[in-house]
Design a protein with these regions (language model features):
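Histidine-centered active-site loop/cap adjacent to the catalytic His
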Residues: 57-60, 78-105
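Secondary-structure boundary motif
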Residues: 55-56, 70-73, 103
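Short acidic/His/Gly/Ser-rich catalytic and metal-binding motifs that mark active-site loops
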Residues: 11-17, 69-75
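Structural beta-sheet core signal
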Residues: 4-6
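Substrate-gating cap/lid alpha-helix
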Residues: 12-64
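A short small-residue
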Residues: 28-30, 73-78
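Catalytic metal-binding/acid-base residues of hydrolase active sites
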Residues: 8, 65-68
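A short helix->loop->beta-strand "cap" motif at the edges of active sites that frequently abuts
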Residues: 1-2, 59
């Protein structure tokens, strides 16, 4: 049986800074995006859509995003590029997946 998971959140501001590190025109990217947090919101919509599909299709869902958002040190779990995880972030991801497997498999 398939299992779905939501993605860990990203930091839109840090990701935009990372994208613009090599003289990319931040102002032009923002003209297209509207604001830096649109990056975060697009990824949030992706996570919400995955959860809706899992519910509709009766597919088990691992709520990775929610466990990250509950962490009061979220910024320490996301790398400087704003999109990848740090080692503590990968540890939290592993723990979340392992806990889910223990409870559901």
């Amino acid at each position: 049986q398939p299992v779905m998971m939501t993605l860990p959140p990203i930091d839109g501001e840090r990701y935009l800074d990372f994208l613009c590190r090599d003289n990319l025109r931040r102002d032009r990217i923002l003209d297209w995006l509207g604001e830096p947090q649109m990056i975060y919101r697009h990824q949030e919509l992706y996570a919400d859509t995955a959860a809706e599909i899992a519910l509709r299709e009766n597919i088990p869902l691992i709520p990775v995003r929610q466990t990250f958002l509950r962490n009061h040190r979220l910024s320490q779990l996301i790398a400087a590029d704003g999109i990848h995880l740090t080692m503590p972030g990968y540890e939290q991801l592993f723990d979340t997946l392992a806990d889910w497997v223990k409870k559901n498999i």
